[in-house]
């Protein structure tokens, strides 16, 4: 097994893994074709710039991945560099699960993030992933704010 950052050559596999992840997480994806057509361009624009993707390979096949999306915003005492990260799309193909691959990828992410000047990494955890994230140092967050959103499209 080889653990490394994804490169531009991995765009097709990353697109496929993202779609599989979304289907497992959400069920039926109504805009699947649009997502499939748009993701390669997104990866070309962002990969290894403000999107780091850590992958596990079995030969050339990517069998697990973890994404770190880096955003720069006005600094605050809670993110003093102004750069925050969001961990997402942590996914392992079913036949490779429970072997520690996701933990290795998360550890790589946490070691690499300070080199990217990231102050803090946040994530939303499923029940399945909760213990994994706790094991690498993530903590539950109690906030005084309400999480809100508005859907525009």
Residue ranges of model-derived segments:
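A short beta-loop-alpha structural element at the N-terminal edge
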Residues: 2-16
């Amino acid at each position: 097994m080889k653990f490394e950052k994804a490169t531009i050559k991995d765009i097709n596999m990353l697109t496929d893994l993202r779609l599989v992840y979304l289907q497992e997480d959400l069920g039926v994806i109504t805009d699947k074709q649009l997502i499939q057509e748009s993701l390669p361009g997104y990866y070309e624009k962002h990969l290894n710039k403000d999107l780091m993707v850590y992958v596990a390979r079995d030969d050339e096949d990517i069998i697990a991945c973890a994404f770190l999306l880096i955003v720069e915003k006005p600094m605050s005492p809670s993110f003093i560099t102004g750069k925050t990260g969001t961990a997402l799309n942590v996914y392992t193909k079913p036949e490779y699960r429970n072997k520690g691959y996701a933990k290795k990828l998360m550890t790589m992410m946490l070691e690499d993030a300070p080199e990217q000047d990231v102050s803090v990494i946040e994530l939303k955890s499923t029940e399945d992933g909760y213990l994994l994230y706790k094991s690498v140092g993530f903590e539950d967050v109690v906030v005084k704010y309400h999480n809100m959103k508005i859907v525009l499209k």
